[in-house]
From Swiss-Prot:
GO terms for cellular component: cytosol. Pathway: Amino-acid biosynthesis; L-tryptophan biosynthesis; L-tryptophan from chorismate: step 2/5. Anthranilate 2 binds at residue 167. It comes from the Bacteria. The keyword Transferase applies. Belongs to the anthranilate phosphoribosyltransferase family. It comes from Stutzerimonas stutzeri (strain A1501) (Pseudomonas stutzeri). This is Anthranilate phosphoribosyltransferase. It is an enzyme of class 2 (transferase). Homodimer. Binds 2 magnesium ions per monomer. One of its GO terms (molecular function) is magnesium ion binding. It catalyses: N-(5-phospho-beta-D-ribosyl)anthranilate + diphosphate = 5-phospho-alpha-D-ribose 1-diphosphate + anthranilate. Its EC number is 2.4.2.18.
Length: 348
């Protein structure tokens, strides 16, 4: 099937099979389609709504064409969201990565610059001084030594360049917002995945189950956030041992007070970084303490997904201790220093 046939199908509200989606994605990601065709396909898929079969096929092609990062362990965890929630909250999942590492987890973080928001994970880390242009081997060394490694999506998904223009020009969430978090080049099988709609929670868990994931929490908060929220109940679809169960959680379940998100919005990466440094440090401001509470909730979920903690509650307790110890703040600075060495190596 070529993209013209696919466009005719989706305009008629007809779904593609997994194999048909794979064929179209290979055409897109090998530069065989025009920008107009790619843009039309992305908008058509959004208007039709992507099926599990379609998403599975698309992720398989992204993984197939990615530059892999190889590890000796399968206990790696990723924390990321689809974006597109329109909330412009600070980079919660990226901040949570340092708390997870401080508590003994290993984070293979996969991310990009902002598409529809104010600050993507790459924007934040770059603002902090983290060198992003790492080889796969350097990412692996970073995870082994620091506990956190960042895989800049464009460096590992070179074929994505063929969709970058249409995505940027559309400025809306598209199929790729859904695909990106599931196309981690390290092949992580433990994950906290935030999604922009409750309706996506179970389908994404089913997709990841078909793709071989072991323990995943797919989350969407009642206030619209693609993270575990401090301000509202969060719906969770948990994949564990091949079974999916759904439930709702709220901050009080973990001894944390529900609070509004006012003060957690940021205008850019520098604003996000300042709030995160306060949250991971001495929490001098009310917003810093509030951000810390939200980071702890999300880091706790990642520790549970990574099987470092045996329950979600234990994960949150471990995250709280790691943040309050100051080790999480040190992990951020350690990553900056560690990647600076790679920058010097790569410039020789």
């Amino acid at each position: 099937m070529d993209i013209k046939e696919a466009l005719n199908r989706i305009v008629g509200q007809l779904d593609l099979t997994t194999e048909e989606m794979q064929a179209v994605m290979r055409q897109i990601m090998t530069g065989q389609c025009t920008d107009a065709q790619v843009g039309a396909f992305l908008m058509g898929m959004r208007m039709k709504s992507e099926t599990i079969d379609e998403i599975v096929g698309a992720v398989q092609v992204m993984r197939e064409l990615a530059a892999p990062v190889r590890f000796d362990t399968d206990k790696l965890v990723d924390t990321c969201g689809t974006g597109g929630d329109g909330m412009n909250i600070f980079n919660v999942s990226t901040a949570a990565s340092f708390v997870v590492a401080a508590a003994g987890g290993k984070v293979a973080k996969h991310g990009n610059r902002a598409v529809s928001g104010k600050s993507g994970s790459a924007d934040l880390l770059e603002a902090a001084g983290v060198f992003l242009d790492l080889t796969p081997e350097q990412v692996a060394r970073s995870v082994d030594t620091v506990g956190v490694g960042f895989m800049f999506a464009p460096a590992h998904h070179g074929a994505m360049k063929y969709a970058a223009g249409p995505r940027r020009e559309l400025g809306l969430r598209t199929l790729f917002n859904i695909l990106g978090p599931m196309a981690n080049p390290a092949g992580v099988r433990h994950q906290v995945l935030g999604v922009f709609s409750k309706a996506l929670c179970r389908p994404m868990a089913e997709v990841l189950s078909r793709l071989g994931s072991k323990h995943v929490l797919v989350v969407h908060a009642q206030d619209g956030l693609d993270e575990i929220s401090l301000a509202a109940p969060t719906h969770v679809a948990e994949l564990k041992d091949g079974e999916i169960r759904e439930y709702s959680i709220q901050p009080e379940d973990f001894g944390i007070k529900s609070q509004s998100l006012i003060g957690l919005n940021v205008e850019d990466a520098q604003g996000s970084l300042a709030l995160i440094r306060d949250a991971l440090g001495r929490r001098k401001s009310e917003n810093g303490q509030k951000a810390a509470d939200m980071i702890v909730l999300n880091a706790g979920a990642a520790l549970y997904a990574a099987d470092v903690a045996t329950t979600l509650k234990q994960g949150v307790e471990m995250a709280h201790d790691a943040l309050c110890s100051g080790i999480a703040r040190d992990k951020l600075e350690e990553l900056v220093s560690f990647t600076a060495v790679f920058k010097q190596e790569n410039q020789k």
